[in-house]
């Protein structure tokens, strides 16, 4: 997953104050507009009447989709409805900022294709808009001999996904890159990187408004009416358009249900918690250090992530959150918790992975246990090297059978498209996801 780290305050500072000049935002023009606009969206050029679009959700996927629509169809009527006072406050703002190159994903899947396309597009976007980013590379470490065959299969998967330059390293070669890492072998993945997704979000908003689009804040979608066009009720007013595109992230299943879709999948919120290495311990990690995935478990496991700001994060675990926006252990939303605990899929998931669920919970309350998991990658790590970091919540779709939906998942409705599963690597792939959404709309 793209990791988690709470950066909401920094985002507000970035958008409203510090980086106006860096992002070339005109001081006399508001970054976020309060009113919609009208234009024509030529999704199918052969049609006489081309549709306007409302995008529900102003996270990085919703904003990237709006930007791609406006780039492909200049002058289009595109409005983003965001429920918060600042865009991108949830998954986007609680993101450690990894640029995923597509190594882990099944060849031919949407995740594989869109991650490979998306990292290239995101790097180009960052270059164009002067967004801080770095292609720093990653090591995927086999911690024992039993993991080497899985590492070899991962190497083959990376090649199948079109990744160039990945290498198998023996122990000595591995230690030349990461002297403190444990294990017996590793994959060197040069394409992987890090980025400031908060700055990406601010640049996307500027780009959208420059092209004539609108981002409406404090506009939670509360009701949907389908007639000759869609009308969406929000506290900021009612908005109408021919098409709706649901990019509501943690609430995408509920938004789709409001719009008349059957809720076949459900978002089950898993909180990922991080520690950070103390400044005096950061020398232990030079790059991104990841484990070889265990196919017996649905989550990747803890790893080390360099931050574009200079720190090192370690984690995450994966525990059930008691609120869809529950970034702290004490956060509780009765509706969200009831929604999760009454879902048969969650209980079937827990029965499939009882030991994993217990261990993930142990890591949430025990720094000593958490550090033991990290020691598999960097044996020198001690609990004293760690300080509490950020956390975030995955918008992970789960089936009634208790399986995590492994690929990006879109559902079509009447003049509607719903993004119902977009966890990692969705931030990396957001621009490519936007293009994919447009392609699906044009085929509908």
Question: Which sequence ranges carry the predicted segments?
Answer:
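Dinucleotide-binding Rossmann-like beta1-alpha1 core, especially the glycine-rich loop
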Residues: 97-173, 183, 301-302, 313, ...
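Helical element adjacent to the flavin cofactor pocket in flavoenzyme catalytic cores
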Residues: 187-242, 431, 435-440
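Glycine-rich FAD pyrophosphate-binding loop
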Residues: 70-92
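Flavin-binding catalytic cores
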Residues: 262-264, 281, 307-309, 314-391
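Flavin-dependent oxidoreductases
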Residues: 64, 224-333
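Beta1/beta-strand and adjacent pyrophosphate-binding region of the FAD-binding site
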Residues: 48-61
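C-terminal catalytic lobe of FAD-dependent flavoproteins
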Residues: 349-444
């Amino acid at each position: 997953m793209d990791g988690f780290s709470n950066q909401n305050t920094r985002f507000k500072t970035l958008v409203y104050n510090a980086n106006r000049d860096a992002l070339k935002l005109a001081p006399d023009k508001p970054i976020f507009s309060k009113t919609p606009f009208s234009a024509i969206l030529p999704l199918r050029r052969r049609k006489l009447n081309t549709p306007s679009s409302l995008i529900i959700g102003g996270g990085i996927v919703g904003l990237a989709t709006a930007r791609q629509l406006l780039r492909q169809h200049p002058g289009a009527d595109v409005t983003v409805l965001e429920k918060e006072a600042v865009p991108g406050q949830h998954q986007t703002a609680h993101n450690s900022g990894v640029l995923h190159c597509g190594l882990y994903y099944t060849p031919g899947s949407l995740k594989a294709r869109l991650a490979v396309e998306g990292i290239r597009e995101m790097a180009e976007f960052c270059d164009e808009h002067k967004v801080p980013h770095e292609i720093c590379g990653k090591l995927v470490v086999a911690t024992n001999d039993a993991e080497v065959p899985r590492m070899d299969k991962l190497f083959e998967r990376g090649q199948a996904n079109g990744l160039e330059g990945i290498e198998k390293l023996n122990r000595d070669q591995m230690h030349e890159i990461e002297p403190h890492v444990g294990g017996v072998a590793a994959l060197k993945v040069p394409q992987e990187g890090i980025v400031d997704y908060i700055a990406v979000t601010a640049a996307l908003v500027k780009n959208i408004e420059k092209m004539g689009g609108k981002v409406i804040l404090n506009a939670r979608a509360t009701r949907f009416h389908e007639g000759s066009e869609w009308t969406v009720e929000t506290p900021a007013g009612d908005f109408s358009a021919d098409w709706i595109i649901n990019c509501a992230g943690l609430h995408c299943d509920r938004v789709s249900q409001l719009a008349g879709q059957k809720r076949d999948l459900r978002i089950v919120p898993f909180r990922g918690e991080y520690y950070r290495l103390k400044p005096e311990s950061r020398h232990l990690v030079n790059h991104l250090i990841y484990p070889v995935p265990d196919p017996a478990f649905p989550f990747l496991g803890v790893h080390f992530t360099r931050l574009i700001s200079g720190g090192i994060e370690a984690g995450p675990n994966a525990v059930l959150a008691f609120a869809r926006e529950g970034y702290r252990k004490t956060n509780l939303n009765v509706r969200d918790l009831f929604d999760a605990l009454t879902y048969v899929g969650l209980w079937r998931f827990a029965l499939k992975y009882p030991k994993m669920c217990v261990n993930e919970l142990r890591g949430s309350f025990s720094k000593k246990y958490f550090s033991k998991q990290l020691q598999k990658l960097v044996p020198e790590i001690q609990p004293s090297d760690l300080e509490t970091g950020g956390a975030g919540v995955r918008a992970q779709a789960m089936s009634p059978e208790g399986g995590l939906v492994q690929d990006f998942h879109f559902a079509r409705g009447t003049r509607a498209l719903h993004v119902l599963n977009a966890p990692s690597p969705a931030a990396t792939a957001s621009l490519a996801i936007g293009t994919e959404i447009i392609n699906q709309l044009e085929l509908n």
